Amino acid sequence: VWDGATRGNWTREIDGSDVVINLAGRSVNCRYNAANRRQMIDSRVQSTRVVGQAIANASRPPRVWLQASTTTIYAHRYDAANDETGVLGGNEVDAPDTWRFSIDVARAWEQAFEEATTARTVALRSAMTMSPDAGGIFDTLMSLVRRGLGGRAGDGRQFISWIHHEISYRRFAG
């Protein structure tokens, strides 16, 4: 098991690999207290830096590095779709603290990724992965609905980005 902060024997597997995929990061499905916030940011930034160092030290580095990121980085808006050309968030006047924090995490995560010196990098800005597995976000949302706590959130016009677990898996299967 990798701690996400140190290089170990796993770095040997990078040497000569075609692709490296880093999906490391503490779950955001938790209370946003100080300890969890610190773990959310550290687990993403530190693991990204360590993977970048391992790639930089490889005698035969991979051609591509796929790095997890998040759609949370985009501004909350109704007027346009968010894609790689979209407006980044964090400057919205009415954004709650938890939104700002999530955007700050995303920016720090991507900055650590951009600082890496590797050939080709791809930031996988993905959203919640919905699966029937116990303990996932779908399980959490269904638990709320079963208790009568589901329904429209806010004004009901906002979008919730998500990806089906099988589609998420297939993007790596080749």
Which residue ranges define each predicted feature?
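NAD(P)-dependent short-chain dehydrogenase/reductase
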Residues: T117-A123, A127-S161, H165
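Conserved Rossmann-fold NAD(P)-dependent oxidoreductase catalytic core, especially the SDR/UDP-sugar
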Residues: R49-D97
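Active-site Tyr-X1-5-Lys
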Residues: N57, V93-A123
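Glycine-rich NAD(P)-binding loop of the Rossmann-fold in SDR/ketoreductase-type enzymes
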Residues: Q39-S47, D97-D104, A108, I163
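Active-site segment of SDR-like NAD(P)-dependent oxidoreductases
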Residues: S27, T70-Y74, A127-M130
